[in-house]
Design a protein with these regions (language model features):
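Residue(s) in the substrate-gating loop at a strand-loop-helix junction
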Residues: 2-285, 290-291
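Catalytic core segments in nucleotide and nucleic-acid processing enzymes
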Residues: 1-49, 288-479
Length: 479
């Protein structure tokens, strides 16, 4: 029996067999799986992480005595294993809910996550409409993704399946194209009435449609939704003359690029890569029996804030991943200074008005309320923002600098400003993601950032040497 389970980032997954836990227990911070499902997930993770360095691993594996445990990191999405486990890993969103409000918290977390995911650049999730978000957040994430793929294929079919010339070789009773001499001799040496020919044929049995058919067949096997499976079977009738793809890697290479004749296939092919190749933004991959669609929340948060800044720009010029400056402009080559820019700077958001510049860098990390540990702010991030401040200074006027983090229970209001030197000031602000559930609140929240100005209070921030262990402890703290 297939079952859907949910856990949040930095949540801990354990085997039920190792703990005396009530069957009714529900929490996004902890998950207790039946032994068979836990072992299946554990083996899947171990296979993917065996040769990876600690910093590249998407899960932490540890033990308490003989009890194995799995801890999620800052990657979200869906994993499906061979034993029927569907695991949704959701972002850690700050809500004021009690433990009894599990279902409400789960629903609202998925609403926020799907909205953020729908703004992820260069991804198929861009077609998740706001109207669809309202109705789909109560469904399993995988089924939401499948339903969106189905919608894309229906659009293609309404316009008619595309055809293109494909290379064919057949033994015919008439001459068509050109004779393949070696094959003609092999097959027709005693039958001069036939010709083994190579020719081009205009057919819908071509690579785009083959990839879509392969995807539909896979989704029909893994979907748990009667509605989705019924829709898939209806769509497959339109692909009866089409064969399955025999080489996914080769076929996806063939459909790469921007072929204007197949623009209406672009979104569907992106989804096909997600489902057939587990192509998200990670190197955590499945196989024929397992599937993993995982995304780094750092990237999702960055793109979502960039989207909001553009949406509520109000006359500001907004650039995301701005590439105007390099850290190094010149080098001494053969004793002569030459323009050889190196180390391009790419702040997440640059907002410009007539006489002011605002540089925003987003960080998906849980800050603390402890000045002793620098609140969990990375020293390298402080250096990075200092470099932005120096490079984006225009006519001796420094830009406003903002480090933006998700709001959490220990970080609910902006920290006192950090003074680098002169008028170069850094603000560290929380962003309340639950405001995305209400358009007016969302606009107010992003405008707090866009209209941020230096406060009058001065906080003497002193950089202390930080070791990675201390930073990791802050980032992975259970909330």
């Amino acid at each position: 029996m297939k079952k859907n389970y949910e856990i949040s980032e930095y949540g801990v997954i354990r085997s039920k067999e190792d703990y005396d836990i009530e069957s009714s227990f529900k929490s996004l911070k902890e998950l207790y799986l039946p032994k068979e499902l836990f072992n299946d997930l554990f083996e899947f993770i171990m296979q993917n992480q065996e040769e990876k360095k600690e910093g590249e691993r998407m899960f932490s594996i540890f033990s308490r005595g003989k009890k194995r445990q799995i801890k999620t990191k800052n990657y979200v999405g869906v994993i499906e294993t061979s034993k029927g486990l569907t695991l949704e890993i959701l972002p850690k969103i700050f809500f004021d809910y009690s433990d009894e409000d599990y279902n409400t918290e789960l629903l609202d977390t998925k609403k926020v996550f799907l909205k953020m995911l729908s703004k992820l650049k260069n991804s198929p999730f861009l077609n998740i409409s706001s109207a669809h978000l309202k109705t789909s957040s109560s469904f399993p994430l995988l089924e939401v993704f499948i339903e969106n793929y189905i919608k894309d294929i229906k659009k293609i079919i309404r316009c008619g399946l595309k055809s293109q010339y494909v290379d064919k070789q057949e033994n015919l009773n008439f001459l068509k194209g050109k004779v393949v001499n070696s094959l003609n001799i092999k097959h027709n040496h005693s039958n001069k009435a036939k010709f083994y020919c190579a020719f081009d044929e205009f057919s819908d049995n071509m690579v785009y449609n083959q990839l879509i058919k392969s995807t539909l067949l896979k989704l029909n096997r893994i979907s748990k939704s009667h509605y989705n499976r019924t829709s898939i079977l209806q769509l497959l009738h339109h692909f009866d003359p089409v064969k399955e793809s025999s080489d996914f890697i080769s076929d996806f290479r063939k459909v790469g690029g921007n072929n204007r004749l197949f623009l209406n296939y672009k979104q569907a092919i992106s989804w096909s890569e997600v489902f057939l190749m587990n192509k998200s933004f990670t190197n955590f991959s499945g196989n024929s029996k397992n599937m993993a669609i995982l995304f780094p929340m750092e990237r999702i948060f960055e793109d979502y804030i960039g989207y909001l800044c553009k949406k509520y720009a109000e006359g500001r010029e907004i650039k995301t991943q701005d590439k105007s400056y390099y850290l190094v402009e010149k080098r001494i080559l053969s004793g002569t200074p030459k323009e050889v820019p190196k180390f391009r700077l790419k702040p997440d958001v640059v907002s410009r008005e007539t006489d002011s510049t605002l540089v925003i860098d987003t960080k998906w990390k849980l800050l603390t309320n402890s000045p002793k540990g620098n609140y969990g702010i990375s020293q390298s991030d402080m250096y990075q923002l200092y470099a932005y401040g120096k490079k984006y200074t225009v006519k001796d006027k420094s830009p406003a600098l903002i480090l933006l983090y998700p709001k959490n229970k220990d970080f609910t209001t902006p920290l006192d400003d950090f003074i680098y030197d002169g008028d170069l000031v850094l603000g560290v602000m929380p962003f309340d993601l639950k405001t995305s559930l209400n358009k007016l609140e969302e606009e107010k929240e992003i405008n707090k950032v866009l209209k941020a100005s230096s406060k009058t209070s001065i906080y003497n921030f002193q950089l202390q040497p930080l070791n990675m262990a201390a930073e990791d402890k802050t980032e992975y703290i259970d909330r």
